[in-house]
């Protein structure tokens, strides 16, 4: 391998390439998503590159410009960009298209400029490999810095240990993407010290991927590992390596993986977490193991069938996905990405945009295969570096098929360098074989000037979006915690026009409406609630909010209309279900209440919240002792015997709230008597409590305890037996213990011992073991 020589005239190119690769190292700077400042940075580097080529590097343009514009790739990409821009005219929310278009353009121009920067460099592949290696070392340093901070306190908390990236999947994918370049350098460099260092980096990368538990990254890393081993066997046979050399090459690859596996098993065992072997065992292309991806893909493909040409519009799948998946969206967390970049593009730009996007990767694959074939044809053997170029492509492809790297600047900056390298290698080779005349300098300058004019407003959009994401944080925090403390001045500081949706697709106007209503600006609140619905017409948050306002104002029929619309739009959304039920209660629509419950139950299953809302609605609309209502309440209580709300509603439907209130009032008197040592009076009052509220076994337990303290042991036993029928384990445990003590005090030793034996077996506590020994072996009982 030749050494890397850097000419002084090429220094700006190397510097710009370094600036591209560090895109993913930026923090969030107060924004709710780390991508916002990274898009700004990537846009700024594109502008810097454009200025460099426009004013300082005409030679690069003269040699690299025309080959690119003779390729299919550039025209396919230009069509893709233009079609994305045209989606503004049919997008559900055109503002989202304007916000996302500069992101698509950023990746395009990053590839465009990386190609220009790489095209004339000597040893292109070697330099880019080293560049990826250096950034990987930085990524691993950040990851393990988090690791040593988090692990002693929280163990293998993969959510908290994330390095540069915003989440674990991005961290793992980014590391996995760069590992093939480490393998390439490991088998290209010959100095022992270099190779040792690369083995350490490879070990650190593989261990990080295994600990993060991101299955897509683990799968792609395993594929890379197996393909590389097969390639080593191929070289051993074709190149006739000695057994010693072949084993060294294979050993240098296997050793870091084996050591990483050992460390993974050790750390996972220490932290009581699943090891990588468990994660690999869960890799399967089934609905159960896909974390909902099959559902996302099915919804997305169904949408494309319905909208083959004019789909949702760039950036609008997070809106369109709501109506597609409305039966399994239980809150306001929407599937804003299809978890497959290729399918996702189809959902936003239709068949034309989707095919163009796939075509870009087909082109790059074709260029790689041509490079491999030409080298094989010339040398009779597969070229090492071109084979290695296939491996990160596989990693990116698997990640794009299961996640959404297209939305992450960390992955897009790496893709830009990688695609620029492939284009540089392929077009440089073809250009040498078939010389192409350079275009006129004026045309080159004009194109770059046009690009600059596009990049500057794109950067402005990124900055506006970033500032909005900074300010959305408090708004989303209060929304998620049902707190509404922001002042009018703070609300006015958050733009609701551009962007008009939060990062989670919530309409900002509607979110502000709740504050306005609470602050007394009711007319404005009503208006803003519905204005927000225009920005995201699929989430029905504004309609549900409008129903709340109207119900509070006593306008039941109007509230019902909006609540019904919100419920039918998202029937599995619990706030919508709750509000619709409240309006049905207000209208006394008893039959519809049952129908709505069964509809939601079929979607959500027997969850506690749907039963609670339903039983509450029955309690407000059915008469006392209604057999149907009591039967439903009993079913809910059987499902959730420990839930106090359901238990209270069950009792309310059975014998009425008045008796429950009277029992609570008597309970206060009983507790006062008990505290004053008037145990028999307390016991009689607790008896009355239990007579009025016989399902509340706390009263029977307290009656038993009062009789016990009053030395009325037979009566105490009677009430402890009643308490033992409770579904509350704490109540049953105390009742069983004091029954044993009462039996012992009543002189019924054998019966007491039987109870103590049951107590220590059913509730294995040291105290009960000691009491069993004390009362059943230390003394002689009657």
Residue ranges and their predicted role:
Residues 292-335, 342-345, 349-356:
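TM-adjacent membrane-interface loops and short helices in multi-pass inner/ER membrane proteins
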Residues 512-516, 528, 543-550, 562, ...:
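TPR/Sel1-like alpha-solenoid repeat signature
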Residues 469, 507, 541, 575, ...:
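Start-of-helix register in tetratricopeptide repeats
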């Amino acid at each position: 391998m030749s050494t890397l020589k850097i000419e002084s005239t090429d220094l700006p190119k190397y510097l710009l390439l370094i600036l591209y690769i560090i895109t993913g190292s930026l923090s969030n700077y107060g924004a709710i998503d780390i991508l916002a400042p990274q898009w700004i940075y990537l846009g700024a580097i594109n502008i810097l590159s454009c200025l460099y080529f426009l004013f300082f590097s005409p030679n690069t343009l003269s040699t690299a410009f025309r080959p690119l514009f003779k390729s299919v790739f550039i025209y396919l990409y230009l069509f893709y960009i233009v079609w994305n821009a045209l989606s503004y005219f049919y997008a559900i929310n055109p503002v989202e298209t304007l916000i996302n278009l500069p992101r698509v353009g950023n990746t395009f121009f990053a590839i465009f400029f990386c190609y220009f920067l790489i095209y004339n460099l000597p040893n292109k592949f070697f330099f880019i490999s080293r560049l990826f290696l250096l950034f990987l070392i930085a990524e691993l340093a950040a990851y393990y810095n988090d690791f040593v901070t988090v692990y002693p306190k929280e163990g293998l908390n993969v959510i908290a240990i994330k390095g540069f990236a915003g989440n674990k999947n991005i961290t793992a994918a980014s590391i996995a993407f760069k590992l093939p370049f480490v393998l390439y350098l490991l088998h290209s460099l010959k100095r022992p010290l270099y190779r040792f260092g690369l083995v350490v980096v490879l070990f650190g990368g593989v261990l990080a991927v295994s600990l993060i538990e991101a299955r897509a990254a683990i799968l792609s890393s395993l594929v890379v590992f197996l393909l590389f081993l097969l390639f080593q066997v191929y070289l051993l046979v074709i190149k006739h390596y000695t057994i010693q050399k072949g084993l060294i090459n294979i050993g240098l690859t296997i050793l870091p993986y084996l050591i990483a596996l050992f460390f993974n098993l050790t750390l996972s065992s220490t932290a009581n977490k699943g090891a990588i072997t468990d994660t690999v065992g869960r890799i399967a292309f089934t609905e159960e193991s896909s974390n909902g991806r099959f559902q996302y893909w099915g919804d997305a493909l169904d949408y494309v069938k319905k909208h083959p040409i004019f789909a949702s519009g760039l950036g609008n799948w997070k809106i369109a996905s709501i109506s597609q998946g409305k039966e399994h969206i239980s809150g306001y967390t929407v599937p804003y990405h299809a978890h497959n970049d290729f399918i996702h593009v189809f959902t936003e730009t239709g068949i034309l945009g989707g095919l163009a996007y796939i075509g870009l990767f087909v082109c790059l694959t074709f260029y790689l295969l041509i490079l491999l074939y030409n080298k094989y044809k010339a040398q009779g053997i597969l070229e090492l570096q071109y084979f290695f170029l296939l491996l990160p492509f596989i990693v990116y492809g698997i990640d794009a098929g299961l996640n959404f790297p297209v939305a992450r600047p960390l992955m897009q900056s790496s893709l830009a360098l990688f695609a620029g390298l492939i284009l540089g290698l392929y077009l440089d080779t073809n250009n040498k074989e078939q010389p192409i005349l350079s275009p006129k300098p004026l045309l080159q300058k004009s194109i770059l000037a046009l690009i600059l004019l596009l990049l500057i407003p794109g950067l402005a959009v990124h900055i506006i979006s970033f500032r909005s994401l900074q300010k959305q944080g408090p708004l989303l925090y209060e929304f998620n915690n049902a707190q509404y403390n922001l002042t009018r001045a703070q609300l006015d500081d958050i733009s609701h026009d551009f962007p008009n949706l939060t990062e989670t697709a919530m309409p900002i106007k509607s979110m502000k409406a709740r504050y306005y209503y609470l602050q007394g600006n009711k007319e404005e609140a009503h208006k803003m609630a519905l204005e927000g619905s225009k920005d995201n017409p699929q989430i029905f948050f504004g309609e549900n909010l409008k129903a709340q306002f109207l119900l509070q104002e006593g306008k039941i029929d109007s509230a019902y209309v909006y609540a019904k619309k919100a419920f039918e739009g998202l029937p599995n959304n619990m706030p919508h279900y709750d509000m619709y039920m409240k309006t049905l209660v207000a209208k006394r629509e008893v039959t519809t209440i049952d129908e709505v419950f069964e509809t939601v139950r079929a979607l959500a299953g027997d969850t506690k919240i749907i039963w609670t809302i339903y039983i509450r609605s029955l309690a407000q609309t059915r008469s006392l002792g209604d057999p149907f209502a009591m039967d439903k309440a009993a079913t809910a209580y059987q499902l959730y015997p420990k839930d106090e709300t359901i238990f209270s509603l069950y009792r309310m439907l059975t014998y009425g709230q008045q008796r429950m209130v009277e029992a609570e009032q008597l309970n206060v008197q009983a507790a006062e008597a008990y505290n004053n040592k008037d145990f028999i009076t307390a016991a009689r009052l607790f008896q009355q409590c239990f007579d009025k509220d016989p399902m509340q076994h706390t009263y029977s337990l307290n009656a038993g305890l009062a009789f016990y303290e009053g030395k009325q042991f037979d009566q105490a036993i009677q009430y402890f037996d009643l308490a033992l029928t409770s579904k509350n384990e704490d109540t049953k445990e105390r009742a069983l213990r004091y029954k044993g003590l009462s039996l012992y005090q009543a002189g019924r030793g054998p019966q007491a011992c039987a109870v103590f034996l049951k107590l220590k077996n059913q509730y294995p506590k040291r105290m009960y073991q000691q009491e069993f020994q004390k009362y059943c072996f230390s003394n002689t009982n009657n």
